[in-house]
Amino acid sequence: MVFYTIGPQTPQIDKGQIYGIIGYSGAGKSTLIRLLNGLEKPGSGSVTIAGQDIAQASVEALRQARLKISMVFQHFNLLWSRTVSENIAFSLQISGTSKSVIQDRVQELIALVGLVGKEQAYPSQLSGGQKQRVGIARALANNPNVLLCDEATSALDPQTTDAILELLLDINRKLWLTIVLITHEMHVVRKICHRVAVMEEGRIVEEGEVLSLFTHPQQPITRQFVKQTSGYISANVPFNPQLVNIDNGKVLKLTFVGQSTQQPVIGELTLKYGLAFNMLHGIMTQTTNGTFGEIWLQVPASQSQLPRILADLHAYEISTEVVTNV
């Protein structure tokens, strides 16, 4: 699936990929969703899904294409007078599926999303997470090729959000289903996405693998999103600078990626140089592309020792930055 109507970049979403699109309110995320399902047409360029340009499709071709492009909504959009089973069956009924097939398919989907025992419950009897599971099951009913999730977890609490993300990841693995995930939360991207596009003012300003964007964000807005998961959104550093004795050496920010996250680097440097390194803050982050970590370290080294310590860190393939704004 390729879309290149927004901005100079041309993202390509491969089959079976979970692709995140992140941006703040007004960035153009909802417009992009409407382009992907043909509710809006681009002023120029094209939106190509499975070899078909959605923007140029006839009314009938677009109707057929939409059967394979499903939506999961932020506020569930369930029919409140219908049971769980009836809500899931609805999309099969309007596509002309026979009753016998509908019954089997509904039971299969209820098991897939973990709602066994809730078949006859009404939406008013369900929690927010259960309602979203019904929405996901309904979206999967016609075996779509693409699942569009528009802020599917933003109305949920953190624990339920993680449960829904795990469900989407499980569905992606079992069905090899392409998922496009619209969100304003970097936690959602980190948790399940393979690649991500960052939107600002109607344009895609940065795009790439999730791990790459976390470790080497290029745009200011991307760096702002990355800070969401680092615990210091409104500060330059994730610790209280007043607790640091600036006369006692330098403060280094170390970034570990992949194998370097598993090495006892600080312990080995302590033994080698006989210095009492002071760890000010540390965090380890897991993405679908791998693990990376950040450590802020006060190094009580002399002017002659510091270059050697930096060289040792580089030998471990650890990125270093001397923090000057403490």
From Swiss-Prot:
GO cellular component: plasma membrane
One protein family per Pfam: NIL
Mode of membrane association: Peripheral membrane protein
Record-annotated ABC transporter domain positions: 1-226
Localisation per UniProt entry: Cell inner membrane
Positions that bind ATP: G23, Y24, S25, G26, A27, G28, K29, S30
UniProt-recorded Gene Ontology molecular function terms: ABC-type D-methionine transporter activity; ATP binding; ATP hydrolysis activity
Keyword annotations: Amino-acid transport, ATP-binding, Cell inner membrane, Cell membrane, Membrane, Nucleotide-binding, Plasmid, Translocase, Transport
Enzyme nomenclature, EC number: 7.4.2.11
Highest taxon, organism lineage: Bacteria
Known catalytic reactions: L-methionine(out) + ATP + H2O = L-methionine(in) + ADP + phosphate + H(+); D-methionine(out) + ATP + H2O = D-methionine(in) + ADP + phosphate + H(+)
Enzyme class: translocase
Family indicated by similarity: Belongs to the ABC transporter superfamily. Methionine importer (TC 3.A.1.24) family.
Subunit (UniProt): The complex is composed of two ATP-binding proteins (MetN), two transmembrane proteins (MetI) and a solute-binding protein (MetQ).
Known role: Part of the ABC transporter complex MetNIQ involved in methionine import. Responsible for energy coupling to the transport system.
Record-given protein name: Methionine import ATP-binding protein MetN
Organism of origin: Erwinia pyrifoliae (strain DSM 12162 / Ep1/96)
Name of the gene encoding the protein in the UniProt record: metN
